[in-house]
Amino acid sequence: TQPIGKIMTQNSSLDLKNHGLMAEGCEFGEVGSYEILKGWAHLNVDPKLPQNSKVVDIEYGPVNKYGTISFSTEVFILRPTDTSRGNGKLFFDYGNRGNKRALQYFNDAVASNDPKTLDHCGNGFLFRRGYTIVWAAWQGDLLPGNNRLIMDLPTAKYGREKITGTVLAEFIAAAPGKKTFPLSGQVSTRSHPTISLKTKDATFT
């Protein structure tokens, strides 16, 4: 077996900026205060590794001079200001649709995609136990907005031709009076451009 870091990524890098203290420096027991880091993770995957073969169409992704496929994701990190006071463990959350929900579910905190206040800390469960909390994006079709985490992904192609196919979208009217939807079905999600304006080829059920 190979180390997971080699399987998933090579030549990775982080571009982070410190955005100050969580909850204006509130102390969480012996762990102390937390700091907020925001930025991007720049990653590479080897399409030839068997462990990456489950990624759909990875064999059609554009490779760089190293033979790997480059992509980037936004990251949001909350960590002890003094890392030596933390527990040395990372709590990683893939946010659904780019949203940050770990503090809401584990700390009973007020929901927020930009956690920074005492209300966003909730009961402090994860903080008092010294976890470093990391969020990253996993969907490449999200639109920027509402502090959602987004990605920068390459486009897979058959040679020079774009890959096309049938797209399935679900429309859910979650509130009374809802009459219009984007083609993607979600205002936060990018719609796929059509290859044909012939509506007879479309199906609505």
What is the predicted function of each stretch?
Residues 9-205:
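C-terminal His-loop and adjacent cap/lid subdomain of alpha/beta-hydrolase
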